[in-house]
Amino acid sequence: MSLSSKLTVKDLSLAGKRVFIRVDFNVPLDGKTITSNQRIVAALPTIKYVLEQGPKAVVLASHLGRPNGERNEKYSLAPVAAELEKLLGQKVNFLDDCVGEHVTAAVNGAAAGSVFLLENLRFHIEEEGSRKVDGEKVKASAEDVQKFRQGLMSLADVYVNDAFGTAHRAHSSMVGFELPERAGGFLLSRELEYFSKALENPTRPFLAILGGAKVADKIQLIDNLLDKVDSIVIGGGMAFTFKKVLENMEIGNSIYDKAGAEIVPKLAEKAKKNGVKIVLPVDFVIGDDFSQDANTKIVSASEGIPSGWEGLDCGPESRKLFSETIASAKTIVWNGPPGVFEIPKFSEGTQAMLAAAVKASEAGSTVIIGGGDTATVAKKYGVVEKISHVSTGGGASLELLEGKDLPGVTFLSSKQ
């Protein structure tokens, strides 16, 4: 799947058309109050561009939360419609469902240039294809799924996907539009542009930085990246399994992944064969408790971590080593923080790495931060604007880095 060959919204002729845009308005809510409108703001460039082209109607569709395939007012998109109206400076017609005769009639009978927001797609089991009942998975029938997709399609002449965060899901609104023109919006296209640059044509040296607790969860990721990168920094809880297996380091009560430990030698062997340098921490900030009240000290890898203590961040020498490694790379993909950044006294390693990433970005290197925790870190320390690209999709970016195809991207039309 070449990421750079997909149709974008700019390739479409939109005048007089009903334009269906799959957006990601899965915003955090406190009751009916939106606590962060970031995802709505992120979709505005695509929505505004489409409106400037003189469409008949713009139909916006999204999921919100996990209503388990049934209507649940707690997950209504009504508050989003009000917020979008404010941001767009134009009336947004909120429809109380996403399919049905009254929905189709409203869209088809609209004045030119009208904007509609449909109710939560996941109020229908047919969007995800299944729901949980008493802990058991119950599938929607193929006929019902087809009918639901036809209902969505009846609202559209062209389809635009701007929901990168859901691109790894083969849901109806992602892969159900059998229309001649299916394009990526600006947000999705930007994601694809950066990931294709890194994964298909990187400027070298290419560095991957990986954190997270379990090696077993990241096997496919590490394995795929070992075919692409020049060096790889392993931090976070994962580092202890690597240090114990490869260097026989004493790790005290630090996190140890027994299943992952069996694979570490194979990964190290592959790295050696491919000429990829594995960079591990050389010292640690350890604590006698997983809290801000913990007693702490710094130990080197050769000293090891005593029993009753656990490694919760990388130490000052490791920070220096990681910063130098980052400074010498031209393409950097970072997925997972190197320490327990949520606890201030164990956040210095993460802050140092972030500072090095910003510096590299400013010096002209391409720095891509995968979604999830690492994106949270970039937001927390206010550096999103200073990094080449902070991904909006945790699961989707991870699957791309693992070498998997994303159904929502594969489904888009290719440029002729």
Swiss-Prot record:
<dbReference type="GO" id="GO:0005739">
    <property type="term" value="C:mitochondrion"/>
</dbReference>
<keyword id="KW-0547">Nucleotide-binding</keyword>
<feature type="binding site">
    <location>
        <position position="168"/>
    </location>
    <ligand>
        <name>(2R)-3-phosphoglycerate</name>
    </ligand>
</feature>
<feature type="binding site">
    <location>
        <position position="373"/>
    </location>
    <ligand>
        <name>Mg(2+)</name>
    </ligand>
</feature>
<feature type="binding site">
    <location>
        <position position="342"/>
    </location>
    <ligand>
        <name>AMP</name>
    </ligand>
</feature>
<keyword id="KW-0808">Transferase</keyword>
<feature type="binding site">
    <location>
        <position position="342"/>
    </location>
    <ligand>
        <name>ATP</name>
    </ligand>
</feature>
<feature type="binding site">
    <location>
        <position position="217"/>
    </location>
    <ligand>
        <name>CDP</name>
    </ligand>
</feature>
<dbReference type="GO" id="GO:0004618">
    <property type="term" value="F:phosphoglycerate kinase activity"/>
</dbReference>
<dbReference type="InterPro" id="IPR015911">
    <property type="entry name" value="Phosphoglycerate_kinase_CS"/>
</dbReference>
<dbReference type="GO" id="GO:0006096">
    <property type="term" value="P:glycolytic process"/>
</dbReference>
<dbReference type="GO" id="GO:0006094">
    <property type="term" value="P:gluconeogenesis"/>
</dbReference>
<feature type="binding site">
    <location>
        <position position="66"/>
    </location>
    <ligand>
        <name>(2R)-3-phosphoglycerate</name>
    </ligand>
</feature>
<feature type="binding site">
    <location>
        <position position="39"/>
    </location>
    <ligand>
        <name>(2R)-3-phosphoglycerate</name>
    </ligand>
</feature>
<keyword id="KW-0418">Kinase</keyword>
<feature type="binding site">
    <location>
        <position position="336"/>
    </location>
    <ligand>
        <name>CDP</name>
    </ligand>
</feature>
<feature type="binding site">
    <location>
        <position position="63"/>
    </location>
    <ligand>
        <name>(2R)-3-phosphoglycerate</name>
    </ligand>
</feature>
<keyword id="KW-0479">Metal-binding</keyword>
<feature type="binding site">
    <location>
        <position position="169"/>
    </location>
    <ligand>
        <name>(2R)-3-phosphoglycerate</name>
    </ligand>
</feature>
<feature type="binding site">
    <location>
        <position position="26"/>
    </location>
    <ligand>
        <name>(2R)-3-phosphoglycerate</name>
    </ligand>
</feature>
<feature type="binding site">
    <location>
        <position position="374"/>
    </location>
    <ligand>
        <name>ATP</name>
    </ligand>
</feature>
<feature type="binding site">
    <location>
        <position position="38"/>
    </location>
    <ligand>
        <name>(2R)-3-phosphoglycerate</name>
    </ligand>
</feature>
<dbReference type="InterPro" id="IPR001576">
    <property type="entry name" value="Phosphoglycerate_kinase"/>
</dbReference>
<comment type="function">
    <text>Catalyzes one of the two ATP producing reactions in the glycolytic pathway via the reversible conversion of 1,3-diphosphoglycerate to 3-phosphoglycerate. Both L- and D- forms of purine and pyrimidine nucleotides can be used as substrates, but the activity is much lower on pyrimidines. Negatively regulates the biosynthesis of acetyl-CoA from pyruvate in the mitochondrion.</text>
</comment>
<feature type="binding site">
    <location>
        <position position="212"/>
    </location>
    <ligand>
        <name>ADP</name>
    </ligand>
</feature>
<feature type="binding site">
    <location>
        <position position="216"/>
    </location>
    <ligand>
        <name>Mg(2+)</name>
    </ligand>
</feature>
<feature type="binding site">
    <location>
        <position position="214"/>
    </location>
    <ligand>
        <name>AMP</name>
    </ligand>
</feature>
<feature type="binding site">
    <location>
        <position position="24"/>
    </location>
    <ligand>
        <name>(2R)-3-phosphoglycerate</name>
    </ligand>
</feature>
<feature type="binding site">
    <location>
        <position position="62"/>
    </location>
    <ligand>
        <name>(2R)-3-phosphoglycerate</name>
    </ligand>
</feature>
<dbReference type="GO" id="GO:0043531">
    <property type="term" value="F:ADP binding"/>
</dbReference>
<dbReference type="GO" id="GO:0046872">
    <property type="term" value="F:metal ion binding"/>
</dbReference>
<feature type="binding site">
    <location>
        <position position="341"/>
    </location>
    <ligand>
        <name>ADP</name>
    </ligand>
</feature>
<dbReference type="InterPro" id="IPR036043">
    <property type="entry name" value="Phosphoglycerate_kinase_sf"/>
</dbReference>
<feature type="binding site">
    <location>
        <position position="23"/>
    </location>
    <ligand>
        <name>(2R)-3-phosphoglycerate</name>
    </ligand>
</feature>
<keyword id="KW-0963">Cytoplasm</keyword>
<feature type="binding site">
    <location>
        <position position="237"/>
    </location>
    <ligand>
        <name>ATP</name>
    </ligand>
</feature>
<feature type="binding site">
    <location>
        <position position="25"/>
    </location>
    <ligand>
        <name>(2R)-3-phosphoglycerate</name>
    </ligand>
</feature>
<feature type="binding site">
    <location>
        <position position="122"/>
    </location>
    <ligand>
        <name>(2R)-3-phosphoglycerate</name>
    </ligand>
</feature>
<feature type="binding site">
    <location>
        <position position="237"/>
    </location>
    <ligand>
        <name>AMP</name>
    </ligand>
</feature>
<feature type="binding site">
    <location>
        <position position="218"/>
    </location>
    <ligand>
        <name>AMP</name>
    </ligand>
</feature>
<feature type="binding site">
    <location>
        <position position="236"/>
    </location>
    <ligand>
        <name>ADP</name>
    </ligand>
</feature>
<feature type="binding site">
    <location>
        <position position="373"/>
    </location>
    <ligand>
        <name>ATP</name>
    </ligand>
</feature>
